[in-house]
Amino acid sequence: MVPRIVNPLDEMLFKEVLKEQQRIKVYIERARYGKVKTIIEGIDEKEFDLEEIAKKLKAKLACGGTAKNGRIELQGDHRDRIKKLLAELGFSEELIEVE
């Protein structure tokens, strides 16, 4: 349950703390015709705009992708770069598991 926050500064601090507590799992899935997708799960879609995070990641990685079903899907294998990029967005690197 999220506490009621009145002060906008408190809300920003609360979101930063939430980012640092997210357990994120990154792995790949095989799609049709041998194509690969990088899947990012574990980001709370009620607290964070998955579409906005996906948009930033797609721009940095120069790939296509989407946010659906509570996860982010990126075209291609980006496991080697995704941990650093999520850390730049404020998520804790220690809580990002890359398979």
Curated annotation (Swiss-Prot):
Pfam families: SUI1. GO terms for biological process: formation of translation preinitiation complex; regulation of translation; translation reinitiation. SUPFAM superfamilies: eIF1-like. Keywords: Protein biosynthesis, Translation regulation. It comes from the Archaea. PROSITE patterns: SUI1. InterPro entries: DENR/SUI1_TIF, SUI1, SUI1_arc, SUI1_arc_bac, SUI1_dom_sf. Gene3D superfamilies: SUI1-like domain. GO terms for molecular function: mRNA binding; translation initiation factor activity. NCBIfam families: PRK00939.1, SUI1_rel. Belongs to the SUI1 family. HAMAP family: SUI1. This is Protein translation factor SUI1 homolog. It comes from Pyrococcus horikoshii (strain ATCC 700860 / DSM 12428 / JCM 9974 / NBRC 100139 / OT-3).
